[in-house]
């Protein structure tokens, strides 16, 4: 968790509530993603870092630059959000604002991102079966990402939010070794 999470939360919540009220959650998610990309561009990121916590002529020029780059890609409401963040010296929270907005959106839509780590790519049948089982257990729609980790001998590790299910062969062997040493 970033140092900016607590600062970003009210902005993310207000953005989420507004987007939900306008029935534009996906549009706002996309626009905030664009804003993050712009804000994390090296030149702009350096300027944001130097303008953190203050509202100066330099920060106004920075806002104008961000708005110019985002022009046509974000709506007037997101432009207003950029201005409010700048006025409060909070442009540095853009990434955390986006992450929190995404979490609120996923919670509202009952979606959970799941990372499945294995030693090799799962087959489509395995993905389908695992997705169905996880959706039943978690009572949410699963958005699965597969990660290949050559250090796993076999099995899989599933991460869904704060929950980790470690079904890797490495962990099973370590448990067995621990049980044998305990005897």
UniProtKB/Swiss-Prot annotation:
Stated family: Belongs to the ATPase delta chain family.
GO MF annotation, one: proton-transporting ATP synthase activity, rotational mechanism
Keyword field contains Transport: yes
PROSITE patterns noted in UniProt: ATPASE_DELTA
InterPro entries with a match to the protein in the record: ATP_synth_OSCP/delta_N_sf (IPR026015), ATPase_OSCP/d_CS (IPR020781), ATPase_OSCP/dsu (IPR000711)
Role summary: F(1)F(0) ATP synthase produces ATP from ADP in the presence of a proton or sodium gradient. F-type ATPases consist of two structural domains, F(1) containing the extramembraneous catalytic core and F(0) containing the membrane proton channel, linked together by a central stalk and a peripheral stalk. During catalysis, ATP synthesis in the catalytic domain of F(1) is coupled via a rotary mechanism of the central stalk subunits to proton translocation. This protein is part of the stalk that links CF(0) to CF(1). It either transmits conformational changes from CF(0) to CF(1) or is implicated in proton conduction.
Oligomeric form and interacting partners: F-type ATPases have 2 components, F(1) - the catalytic core - and F(0) - the membrane proton channel. F(1) has five subunits: alpha(3), beta(3), gamma(1), delta(1), epsilon(1). F(0) has three main subunits: a(1), b(2) and c(10-14). The alpha and beta chains form an alternating ring which encloses part of the gamma chain. F(1) is attached to F(0) by a central stalk formed by the gamma and epsilon chains, while a peripheral stalk is formed by the delta and b chains.
Keywords: ATP synthesis, Cell inner membrane, Cell membrane, CF(1), Hydrogen ion transport, Ion transport, Membrane, Transport
Chief location of this protein within or outside the cell: membrane
Membrane-topology annotation of the record: Peripheral membrane protein
Originating organism: Vibrio atlanticus (strain LGP32) (Vibrio splendidus (strain Mel32))
Protein name: ATP synthase subunit delta 2
Keyword Membrane: yes
GO annotation, cellular component aspect: plasma membrane; proton-transporting ATP synthase complex
Gene3D superfamilies linked to this entry: N-terminal domain of the delta subunit of the F1F0-ATP synthase (1.10.520.20)
Subcellular location, record wording: Cell inner membrane
Superkingdom, taxonomy of origin: Bacteria
Pfam families: OSCP (PF00213)
């Amino acid at each position: 968790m970033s140092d900016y999470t607590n600062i970003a939360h009210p902005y993310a919540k207000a953005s989420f509530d507004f987007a939900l009220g306008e029935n534009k959650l996906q549009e706002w998610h996309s626009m905030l993603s664009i804003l993050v990309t712009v804000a994390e561009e090296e030149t702009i990121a350096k300027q944001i870092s130097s303008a953190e916590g203050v509202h100066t002529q330099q920060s106004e020029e920075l806002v104008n630059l961000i708005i110019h780059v985002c022009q046509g890609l974000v709506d007037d409401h997101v432009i207003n959000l950029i201005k409010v963040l700048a006025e409060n010296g909070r442009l540095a929270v853009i990434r955390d604002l986006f992450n929190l907005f995404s979490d609120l959106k996923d919670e509202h839509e009952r979606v959970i991102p799941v990372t499945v780590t294995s030693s090799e790519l799962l087959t489509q049948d395995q993905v389908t079966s695992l997705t169905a089982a996880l959706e039943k257990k978690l009572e949410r729609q699963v958005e699965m990402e597969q990660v290949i980790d050559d250090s796993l001998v076999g099995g899989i590790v599933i991460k869904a939010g704060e929950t980790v299910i470690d079904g890797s062969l490495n962990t099973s062997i370590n448990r067995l070794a621990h049980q044998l040493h305990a005897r």
